[in-house]
Structures are given as C-alpha cells and as structure tokens.
C-alpha cells in the first residue's frame, strides 16, 4: 500500500472511536515533568485540537509544573513540605496563583490559538469553579476541595473554545487555596460525568512490579486496583492519583487512563486505537 492508502486505512479504523467520543466530555490533566519539554507540550496541544475538531468536549486542567517553584525562588520564598504538601502562607498562595493563572494558563491558551484553535483560560477561582477549605493550620493556605461548580466549563464547551483550567481554589472565606492538581482535575471530571479522564504523567501507567515492563497493566477495574494498593504494589507517587480517580468514578466518571504524556501523540493512540497506550481503569 502507498503512504496515502495507509493513512486512509488508519482514519477508517479510527472512525468507530470518533463516533464513540463525539459529543462526550474528556478531561485531561496536564502537569508535572510533562510540562517541561516544549516539543511534548506542542504534541499534546495538537492532539487536543484534533479531539476538539472531531466533536469531543475536551477540558484541559493543568498544574504549575516548575513555574511555581521558579517564582517562589525569585521572590526568595523557601518551600517547606509536610507529608508531600507545600506549606503555603498568604504570599506563597498569591505567587502560586500568579504562576498558575498568569504564566502557565495564558501560555497554554496562547499556544492553542497559535496552533490554529481557540481556548478560554480560567482558574478554579472564576465562578467559584473549585471551592476548598483549609486542611490544617500547619499547612496554611493548602486546601481540601469541598465543591465543584462546573457551569463555567459547560458554557465554554458550547463554543468552539477549549476550556483551560488552572487548578487554584477559592474558600468560602474568600481566600485563595493551593489544591492538588490531580485531585482538582479528577473532581472536575466527576462533576461533568466525563466519559474519560486522562491523567498525563512521566510514566507509562500502572505496573504490578514497577519498573518491570513485563508487569505493565493495560487494563484494570477498581476492585483489582484496590488489591494492588493493599498489597503495596503501587508506588507512593501513584497513590494520590489513584485515590483521585476512585473518587471521581464514584461521582459519575466513566473511565480513567494513566498515560505517559512524553510519548508523541499519546492521546490519539489512547483514544483512537484498539490497543491504547496507557493503563485503562474502569468500574
């Protein structure tokens, strides 16, 4: 077959997936080390634009990547951590918001427009999208999410724009709170009853015995996932992601995928091919 015929065959095979996801909501969490490489970022954003073009309601939720740490260092704010959570005073919370909603969010919106799409950037503060309360006095302005109000996302989804959400939160006291971006994204996915929640990271997915490639898990249900957690076969860094996914699936999320965002066009390979690319988690 010629290259053109191969391309046509691939598109034909993808048709059933285009139809499956058309008019469905797919929430994508983008953050961490995946944000560092500009080529990786462009590949992810191009995939997102294609998803939008074929009629999928794509919602992009992001963390701060290295931007928060860089801004805190610039203003000589030392980071302290308690049980993996950054201790956040009021100034740190304001700087984190600047990095998230200012630098990172608007950069993503700009890049999507540059690539030929459209995007509207908001933070969890806008429209009280993400509400939170303080976890403890020791952590300062670190929040536990108490409610999601997705109306602003639903309105954006009625347009040709991709909603790009910075994972900051607002309290009933009017204060800004730092919340876990994975948790924020999963809660948004649950509130929208999304068909799919894709959590991009810098690992392939779940393993029964990490990093043994022979133990890679293509698909798993919640019951067997619980067994892996109890058997301590899930690495510590994955536990918060798993807990976030479990909560969202209880709230109405259809499926979740842990996916290596560094793989070129990983989103397309996951959604539009039979084999997929990462670990699919279902009910």
Swiss-Prot record:
SUPFAM superfamilies, A to Z: Carbamate kinase-like
The keyword Metal-binding is annotated on this UniProt entry: no
GO biological process, one term: arginine biosynthetic process via ornithine
Amino-acid positions noted as binding substrate in the UniProt annotation, renumbered to this chain: 64-65, 86, 178
Main location class: cytoplasm
Listed pathway(s): Amino-acid biosynthesis; L-arginine biosynthesis; N(2)-acetyl-L-ornithine from L-glutamate: step 2/4
Site keyed Transition state stabilizer: positions: 29, 241
Pfam families: AA_kinase (PF00696)
Subcellular location: Cytoplasm
EC number, UniProt record: 2.7.2.8
Enzyme class: transferase
UniProt entry keywords in alphabetical sequence: Amino-acid biosynthesis, Arginine biosynthesis, ATP-binding, Cytoplasm, Kinase, Nucleotide-binding, Transferase
GO MF term (any one): acetylglutamate kinase activity
GO CC, any one term: cytoplasm
Reaction catalysis annotation: N-acetyl-L-glutamate + ATP = N-acetyl-L-glutamyl 5-phosphate + ADP
NCBIfam families found in the cross-reference section: argB (TIGR00761)
Task performed by this protein: Catalyzes the ATP-dependent phosphorylation of N-acetyl-L-glutamate.
Entry similarity comment: Belongs to the acetylglutamate kinase family. ArgB subfamily.
Protein name: Acetylglutamate kinase
Annotated organism of origin: Lactococcus lactis subsp. cremoris (strain SK11)
Gene coding for it: argB
